[in-house]
């Protein structure tokens, strides 16, 4: 079987690290959300997930959050072994690869700091270079990576730019992965300085990405658009979406809703992959821009190439690909790879942010409550005016 040979390099530039994979074909990664629930669905999904990881020659995994449906109590919580290490291990080591993840709504209900601490101590600085340590006892399951509540990961891969390598040579494509915490970005997040820094860092990340990356993928828990039970987030649609559109983001990968879906809007695909261990049906009305929706337990496999991005939705109920979505590569006028190192220098430092323990999260963002309240007030005024008009006519 022919497969891609990869070489893993990491360089440390001034205040941040950049990880580079040199891949002599397409770049493949998988996405899996809301996976940490002790169910038959998780076991079945993990079975097919490991098969596809091996057969598709996936390079790394991204998780949009809600890793542990009931959260974790700490670093010694049995959930780490029972719901992660044992479930996603593979004897031959095929599953040992980076597992990039962020916190989701349900993770914040437990000891969220433990999940951050689990991802520390991975990056070792030696003479200005950063490397990922390979633990002797961690070769059979994915390597947990979460250096901060939000962070970025830049990579590149090489493809043939034409049918004849001799005539046309190779073409280098860059991909930027930006991981966000949608709760930290929420207006309801109690620590405003951290909230503001997360937004400022995101703007800087997107500003750099659109200058050096052919592909931009943003990963976060809550969907912006959804036909699932959340119906998406009006707050993210108002504040986050314009930033993503301005940067010409290709994919926004989310979880939160326990289903699989793709909604395409202005050349950006909104991918929901939140059925890693359980599933729920769609809400009463399907989003008008939804191209595909499934309540099956499953996951996604993504392939980046010279032509664009192909996303395969895999159903573990059926054990096969049930939908394939294709997004053409964009010709971004903002690209300036000649000055890539200069742009890299503008990236924010990736370091662990100290977030104190806090109380339960609010059920709704302040934005939603305020807009809803205004709507009720307007409605009340209309009803009052209508009633007054009716009484006035009948009193004459």
UniProtKB/Swiss-Prot annotation:
Lumenal-side segments: 1-369
Q: Per the record, GO CC terms?
A: endoplasmic reticulum; endoplasmic reticulum membrane; glideosome; inner membrane pellicle complex; plasma membrane
Q: Where does a metal cation 1 bind?
A: 195
A single GO BP term for this record reads: symbiont-mediated suppression of host complement activation
Post-translation changes: The N-terminus signal is likely to be cleaved.
**According to the UniProt record heading this chain, what is the dependence of activity on pH?**
Optimum pH is 5-7.
What is the protein's membrane topology class? Answer: Single-pass type I membrane protein
What is stated about the way this protein's activity is regulated? Activity is independent of metal ions.
MF GO annotations: acid phosphatase activity; ferric iron binding; ferrous iron binding; protein-membrane adaptor activity
Question: How is its cofactor bound, per UniProt?
Answer: Binds 2 metal cations. The role of the metal cation is unclear.
Cofactors (names): a metal cation
Chain ranges on the Cytoplasmic side, renumbered to this chain:
391-396
The UniProt entry's coiled-coil ranges are: none
Intracellular or extracellular location(s): Inner membrane complex; Cell membrane; Endoplasmic reticulum membrane
Q: Which reaction does it catalyse?
A: a phosphate monoester + H2O = an alcohol + phosphate
Question: Looking at the Swiss-Prot or TrEMBL record, what is one Pfam family this protein matches?
Answer: Metallophos
Provide the alphabetized UniProt keywords.
Cell membrane, Endoplasmic reticulum, Hydrolase, Membrane, Metal-binding, Signal, Transmembrane, Transmembrane helix
What EC number(s) does this enzyme carry? 3.1.3.2
Top-level taxon of origin: Eukaryota
The membrane-spanning stretches of this chain are 370-390
Q: Identify its protein family.
A: Belongs to the metallophosphoesterase superfamily. Purple acid phosphatase family.
The domain comment in this protein's record states: The C-terminal transmembrane and cytoplasmic domains are required for the trafficking of the protein to the inner membrane complex.
What does this gene product do? Component of the glideosome complex, an inner membrane complex structure involved in parasite gliding motility and host cell invasion. During the asexual blood stage, may play a role in the assembly and anchoring of the glideosome complex to the inner membrane complex. During the sexual stage in the vector mosquito midgut, protects gametocytes against host alternative complement pathway-mediated elimination by interacting with host complement inhibitor factor H.
Name of the protein this chain belongs to:
Glideosome-associated protein 50
The protein's organism comes out as Plasmodium falciparum (isolate 3D7)
Q: Taxonomically, what lineage is the organism?
A: Eukaryota, Sar, Alveolata, Apicomplexa, Aconoidasida
Gene this chain is encoded by = GAP50
């Amino acid at each position: 079987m022919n497969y891609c040979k990869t070489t893993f390099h990491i360089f440390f530039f001034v205040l941040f690290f950049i990880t580079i994979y040199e891949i002599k074909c397409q770049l493949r990664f998988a996405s899996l959300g809301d996976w940490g629930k002790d169910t038959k669905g998780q076991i079945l999904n993990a079975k097919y997930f490991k098969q596809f990881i091996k057969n598709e020659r996936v390079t790394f995994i991204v998780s949009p959050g809600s890793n542990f449906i009931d959260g974790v109590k700490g670093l010694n919580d049995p959930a780490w072994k029972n719901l992660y290490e044992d479930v996603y291990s593979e004897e031959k080591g095929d599953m040992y690869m980076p597992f990039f993840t962020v916190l989701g709504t349900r993770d914040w209900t437990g000891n969220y700091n433990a999940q951050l601490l689990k991802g520390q101590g991975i990056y070792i600085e030696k003479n200005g270079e950063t490397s990922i340590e390979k633990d002797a006892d961690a070769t059979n399951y994915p390597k947990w990576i979460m250096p901060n509540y939000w962070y970025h990961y830049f990579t590149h891969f090489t493809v043939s730019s034409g049918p004849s390598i001799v005539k046309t040579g190779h073409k280098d494509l860059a991909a930027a992965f930006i991981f966000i915490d949608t709760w930290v970005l929420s207006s309801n997040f109690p620590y405003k300085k951290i909230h503001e820094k997360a937004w400022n860092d995101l703007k800087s990340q997107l500003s750099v990405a659109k200058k050096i990356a052919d592909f931009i993928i943003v990963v976060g828990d809550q969907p912006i658009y959804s036909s699932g039970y959340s119906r998406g987030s009006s707050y993210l649609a108002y504040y986050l979406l314009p930033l993503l559109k301005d940067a010409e983001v290709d994919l926004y990968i989310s979880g939160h809703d326990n289903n699989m879906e793709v909604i395409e809007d202005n050349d950006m695909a909104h991918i929901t992959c939140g059925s890693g261990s359980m599933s729920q049906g769609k809400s009463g009305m399907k989003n008008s821009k939804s191209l595909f929706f499934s309540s099956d337990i499953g996951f996604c496999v993504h392939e980046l190439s010279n032509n664009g991005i192909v996303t395969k939705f895999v159903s573990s109920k059926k054990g096969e690909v049930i939908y394939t979505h294709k997004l053409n590569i964009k010709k971004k006028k903002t690209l300036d790879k000649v000055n890539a190192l200069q742009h890299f220098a503008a990236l924010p430092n990736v370091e662990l942010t100290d977030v104190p323990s806090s109380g339960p999260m609010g059920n709704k963002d302040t934005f939603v409550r305020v807009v809803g309240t205004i709507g009720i007030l307007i409605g009340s005024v209309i009803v009052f005016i209508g009633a007054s008009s009716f009484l006035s006519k009948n009193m004459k």
